[in-house]
Amino acid sequence: MDYTHQPALIPCGQDKYMPKSELLLHLKTYNLYYEGQNLQLRHREEEDEFIVEGLLNISWGLRRPIRLQMQDDHERIRPPPSSSSWHSGCNLGAQGTTLKPLTMPTVQISEVDMPVEGLETHSPTDSRGLKPVQEDTPQLMRTRSDVGVRRRGNVRTSSDQRRIRRHRFSINGHFYNHKTSVFTPAYGSVTNVRINSTMTTPQVLKLLLNKFKIENSAEEFALYVVHTSGEKQRLKSSDYPLIARILQGPCEQISKVFLMEKDQVEEVTYDVAQYIKFEMPVLKSFIQKLQEEEDREVEKLMRKYTVLRLMIRQRLEEIAETPETI
């Protein structure tokens, strides 16, 4: 059998494949929609594997609070290689630990050394009214290098706070705070992660939680494709979220990818989603119509089998009346 002319297939889930040409058409439409924006996707081939990579928008759909990890002052943070950012690692030791600030010895300065403003100083003079004679008392000149500064250990400087924030993303401007470390992100607010088409749903979940230093386990959450019609489709652990987003289309007014709790959300099929947005009186009228249609079908079946029953009985009677032939 000749396989040379078979189209290349791209995996899009467990035991699910699609032609590469079809995916490229979807990708072209996706990039045209986001032309000139950072949400455009790029593709490449690496060791005969077709890979798409870029940013994926994910909306927060959590109902319960999440816990942010506490920032560890001794956490190992690698300074960026840029020479202009040397200060981000200036407090790190050889093993990546934070060094304690050195305290210079404090020099005590007596009140005599400091002149008091507003008071006249009288120097001793000779009896002939000559210029005052300066005493040879040694004076201690205070300079910045002579006086050490005591820093309180429990207070972070502005540079320390900037360093911490550089290594921690915020959720809608919310950074870790010991008073607000447990909170619920605003429903529908959007974040994004940079992923590729080979990353499965669990991998994307772990990447998202690690980006914001969320302490909760990835097993508590799931990714859902939510349509404006109300349809909710949960992405399986074998699915590729970036491929799913491309196949759904780029417009987020039609469908979005949501991060939700596993035990709080149920999938809604397309057939059920058609009726979700109707009011109760309308839904009751639908039920009444369906009941009437069901009654008509039942009555039709009863008439059909009643006729069949009569035909069988007539035939049995005819057989009984006919004399047996030898």
From Swiss-Prot:
Principal subcellular localization: nucleus
Function, as annotated: Potential tumor suppressor. Acts as a KRAS-specific effector protein. May promote apoptosis and cell cycle arrest. Stabilizes STK3/MST2 by protecting it from proteasomal degradation.
GO biological process, one term: regulation of osteoblast differentiation
Keyword Chloroplast (UniProt): no
Single GO term (MF): protein kinase activity
UniProt superkingdom: Eukaryota
Domain Ras-associating: 176-264
Alphabetical UniProt keywords: Cell cycle, Centromere, Chromosome, Cytoplasm, Kinetochore, Nucleus, Phosphoprotein, Tumor suppressor
Subunit record text: Interacts directly with activated KRAS in a GTP-dependent manner. Interacts (via SARAH domain) with STK3/MST2 and STK4/MST1.
Annotated SARAH domain residues: 272-319
The organism of origin for this protein: Mus musculus
Compartment list: Nucleus; Cytoplasm; Chromosome, Centromere, Kinetochore
Record PTM text: Phosphorylated by STK3/MST2 and STK4/MST1.
One GO CC term, this protein: nucleoplasm
Designated name of the protein: Ras association domain-containing protein 2
Ribosomal protein recorded as keyword: no
